[in-house]
């Protein structure tokens, strides 16, 4: 089989945005345009800056995760009521 040409798949105009998850009470959808991805990442960065800035333990845990250390995730405990 020989491939003559390749072009990116264009999203259908009538296909509505499909929710793929939730974050902070909002549904998260796949962005059709690359610029929308950037604004979503920027929004997440702003949220992290606001909510983590005052807590040194959270900052340290996020830094360890950014450095590739998974112990903050492994060390989580489940609260029991």
Curated annotation (Swiss-Prot):
Gene source species: Pseudomonas aeruginosa (strain ATCC 15692 / DSM 22644 / CIP 104116 / JCM 14847 / LMG 12228 / 1C / PRS 101 / PAO1)
Subcellular localization, as worded in the UniProt entry: Cytoplasm; Secreted
Primary role: Acts as a negative regulator of the type III secretion regulon (T3SS) expression. In the absence of inducing signals such as low Ca(2+) or host cell contact, the T3SS/injectisome is expressed at a low basal level and exists in a quiescent state due to ExsA sequestration by ExsD. ExsE binding to ExsC disrupts the complex between ExsC and ExsD, thereby allowing free ExsD to bind ExsA. Upon inducing signal, ExsE is secreted allowing ExsC to bind ExsD. In turn, ExsD cannot bind ExsA and prevent ExsA-mediated transcriptional activation of the type III secretion system.
Transmembrane segments: none
Protein name: Type III secretion regulatory protein ExsE
Residue span of region Disordered: 55-81
Deletion phenotype: Deletion mutant deregulates expression of the type III secretion genes.
GO molecular function, one term: protein-folding chaperone binding
GO CC list: cytoplasm; extracellular region
NCBIfam families: ExsE_fam
Domain of life of the source: Bacteria
Keywords: Cytoplasm, Secreted
Assembly behavior: Interacts with ExsC.
A Pfam short name: T3SS_ExsE
Gene: exsE
BP GO terms, sorted: cellular response to calcium ion; negative regulation of protein secretion; protein secretion by the type III secretion system
């Amino acid at each position: 089989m020989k491939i003559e040409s390749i072009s990116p798949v264009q999203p259908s105009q009538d296909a509505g945005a499909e929710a793929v998850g939730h974050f902070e009470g909002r549904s998260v959808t796949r962005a059709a345009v690359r610029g929308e991805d950037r604004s979503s990442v920027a929004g997440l960065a702003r949220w992290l800056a606001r909510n983590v800035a005052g807590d040194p333990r959270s900052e340290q845990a996020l830094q360890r995760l950014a450095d590739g250390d998974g112990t903050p995730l492994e060390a989580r405990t489940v609260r029991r009521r």
